[in-house]
Amino acid sequence: SDRCKDLGISIDEENNRRLVVKDGDPLAVRFVKANRRG
């Protein structure tokens, strides 16, 4: 059975890249931190 996967990338106010992977359930979410200058 082939299911549709929704890929979405959003940037929050802290310039962190948020990669959201939804496969039927919104539980599969990965957070990727962007490189921050310190």
Curated annotation (Swiss-Prot):
Keywords: Disulfide bond, Protease inhibitor, Serine protease inhibitor. GO terms for molecular function: serine-type endopeptidase inhibitor activity. Belongs to the protease inhibitor I3 (leguminous Kunitz-type inhibitor) family. Inhibition of trypsin. Heterodimer of an alpha and a beta chain linked by a disulfide bond. This is Kunitz-type trypsin inhibitor beta chain.
